[in-house]
Regions:
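Short alpha-helical elements
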Residues: 1-256
């Protein structure tokens, strides 16, 4: 997959150029569009960097540029710019948002790797807005319960505003979580666990919104189309998260 002219026109001013030495010595920088297309090929196929076709750029160039962009937080800034623009144009709705996590198997080393019954892995957390596009994404160890990963997920959101309502499955039925979010002005909506011992705190009225939770499942299906995200090959969690952010960028570009 390669960027269309319309998509590149949006990304070009956001991704920025690369600095040159004052004496202009050394090899010239490869064009950012060719390099980014090469990185997106890796994202889509999940192939090793060394298998990158020569029509893009040398794989060493794409790999170095990718790591540099990740360190500089460029993908994060692009997401913030795209999401803010969509929100201002009414194409993002924070009146109700959906949250969920997915277990990602991969390397038994590096950061954000933890043991579970399914083996060691990483938990990919994501939040979708009322229409379904991504609003937040973060990577964490797979060991903690998902209810403990809500705060990091909210902190990774692409816009400044908080959602009015946050909808999740039974894993998010936790009174301390409800109280913590209520202090932020966020209403947590989740079905009660079958083994819940405390009195119920929700009735059928807010739970009607739970029927639209399929939108977060659709978001994970969209992300699953990028094979580099299905299994974590990166030793460093930040490099894996960079690919997640790239996938979210492509999804947001389609909403424009």
């Amino acid at each position: 997959m390669e960027l269309t002219d319309e998509q590149w026109a949006v990304l070009d001013p956001l991704i920025g150029g690369m600095p040159r030495r004052a004496d202009r010595r050394g090899r010239p920088w490869r064009r950012s569009r060719a390099v980014l297309n090469g990185i997106l090929w890796i994202l889509r196929t999940g192939a090793p960097w060394a298998d990158l076709p020569e029509r893009f750029a040398p794989y060493q160039t794409c790999h170095r540029r990718y790591q540099r962009w990740v360190r500089e937080g460029r993908f994060e800034r692009i997401l913030e710019a795209l999401a803010t623009d969509l929100k201002e144009r009414g194409k993002l709705d924070l009146s109700e948002c959906f949250i969920d996590g997915a277990f990602i198997a991969g390397e038994n080393r590096g950061g954000c790797v933890g043991p579970t019954k399914r083996g060691k892995g990483t938990k990919l957390m994501a939040m979708a807005d009322r229409f379904g596009p991504p609003l937040a994404a973060c990577a964490a160890s797979a060991s903690p319960h998902e209810s403990r990963l809500v705060a990091p997920t909210l902190d990774s959101r692409f816009v400044a505003a908080l959602p009015q309502r946050l909808i999740g499955d039974r894993a998010y039925d936790a009174d301390p979580l409800d109280a913590e979010l209520a202090k932020l002005g966020v209403e947590m909506i989740a079905p009660h666990r079958r083994n819940r011992k405390r009195p119920k705190t929700q009735d059928g009225r807010p739970l009607r919104r739970y029927r639209r939770r399929w939108k977060i499942e659709r978001l994970f299906a969209w992300l699953g189309n990028f094979r580099r995200l299905v299994v974590r090959y990166e030793r460093y969690a930040l490099n894996y998260l960079g690919f997640v952010q790239l996938g979210c960028i492509l999804i947001l570009l389609r909403q424009g």
